[in-house]
Amino acid sequence: MRRVTRTIAAAGAAIACCITMTACSSPFGLPISGSVQTLAPVEQQAQRVYTNPQGPADDAQPETIVKGFYDAMPAGVQSDGYRVAREFLTGSASAGWNGDSAALVYSGTPDFRRRANTISAPQGAESSLIVEVELQVVGSLDSHGVYTPSNSTQTRRLPYTLMKKSGQWRISSLESGVVISTADFEQVFRQVSVYQVSTSGKQLIPDIRWLSWRNWRTQAVGEVLSDAPSWLEGVLRGAGLSTIKLAVDSVPVKNNVVEIHLNSGINALNEEERGLLVHRIRLTMGDGNAEYALRITGDGVDYSDADANVKLTTEQPTAGVYTLTGGHIVSLASSSPLRVGEAPGYDDARGFVFSSSGGAVLRADGVVECLKSDGASCGVMFSGEPMRSITEGLDGEVWAVSENGRELHVSDGGKETDLKLDWLGAADSIVALAVSPEGCRLALAVEGEDTNGVMMTGVARNGDKTLSGLSKAATQVSVLRHVTMLTFYNDLNLVYATTPPEGNSEQQEAWRQMAPGPANAQRLPNGTITSMASGQISLSRRLAIVDDLGIVRSVSGSLDGSWTIADSQVTALGAQ
């Protein structure tokens, strides 16, 4: 067999990568310390395309009426509050329909077909029939703006009952909620991070929602005051906000200042709780900007400065990228690769995490070996039990997936913790995992009978940020099968990829998304990718990959740019 040289690359801080047992040996190492940098909040779409739908034409056929309703729904979410969409409904149907209660997101072109209505037309109607719409649904939103992906290979049929009165067809019966195309989704829904406070009281968790552009501020305040989704239960600091509501169902902007008027419930909070609430609202309104200007009152009392002493920020630690090549540990953080340690004997390593304070390597036999800051061994972890993959956690943690894929193991400063996932099906197993930058979310690639795809669950922390447990629930963020590697590019965006059949790199898939949210295809360089990570390369934050020839490439910004080689000599540094 021809031997090829290759590298094992590693990325760091709270952003990690993992690979499966069968994947090639090119994992990234993850730094566990370093300076803190402020990441610019994700830029919200500034130039939206506003739609101007037309109402129903006289004598329009039933299919045309339903098509017109579909054309009008995006404007209802975005700007007109369903004024035009309701023109396609009968009066009683309009009164009972709530477009904001949910959303279905579809790809492709809907198919509109009529069929007979077996129920007699209601009194006063000249005729009645059903128009059935067949869709490729890729996801849905609930009333809180939480996104859940769907299997797009399965079609869904939505029935609309129409009646004819005075010679005109109108929709008389339909389910509440809207149906929006993937092309329109980000034009009509705004991504909003509802910032939650972890059980440690020292970390902020971005709880991603998708809210209608026309009144997103009002909805966002409501979500800050509402219960968190089930997958974060048990990992958030309780605040007792059930009695606090908006005094009026509106959040106006006056002289470029957002004004939020709450009822007297906020007065019952103590000073610390009130400060945290105001801070969470400020960060949520400002996309993570702690200096965002707003005015908050509670029953007429001005609390705009209540968070003046709250120090929680959305800043993330700088994440370096390291490679394990030919027995050397190399940092790619600066403009030129820098050798920082010696770790011989791991040419067939299957995983690697590292920082200036040390790390760990997943040996070819599955045993996780501790590394000192100079690369020297400091013993084995997890009692020498074989593991499937390892990844970096918070402040030096090493997370590992058991060989059977059923349990997680965490090493932190010599203390080891075993974790079980209550939501994992009996026939399911974990393939890979990544820990979010703040350390309070886990993304896991899962395969089995009950669950396939990428799941996300919460991580509970003590006051000193040490691990205390996991949420008992999880949320699905992708239904893509055979995911074997994943990493948080930043605190909002998750990137993941499959391992293709041997010798067929063209079948390898990679995706990125604000999680949970719609996924976008991630372009990969040529070759078969064996591992990925995120961190600082050549003085800027980048997504990095390593291919089956050991070449490390990286891309930055929107992740749609050109891939550049991070180290042109890696093919001579190690052997598989």
Curated annotation (Swiss-Prot):
Disulfide-linked positions: none
Pfam families per UniProt: Gmad1 (PF10647)
Classification via InterPro entries: Lipoprotein_LpqB, Lipoprotein_LpqB_C
Membrane topology: Lipid-anchor
Signal peptide: 1-16
Keyword Lipoprotein belongs to the record: yes
Intracellular or extracellular location(s): Cell membrane
Main location: membrane
Domain of life: Bacteria
Alphabetical UniProt keywords: Cell membrane, Lipoprotein, Membrane, Palmitate, Signal
CC annotations in GO: plasma membrane
Keyword Lipoprotein attributed: yes
Annotated lipid attachment (S-diacylglycerol cysteine): C17
Lipidation (N-palmitoyl cysteine): C17
Family, per entry: Belongs to the LpqB lipoprotein family.
Name listed for the protein in its UniProt record: Lipoprotein LpqB
Origin species: Bifidobacterium longum (strain DJO10A)
Lineage: Bacteria, Bacillati, Actinomycetota, Actinomycetes, Bifidobacteriales
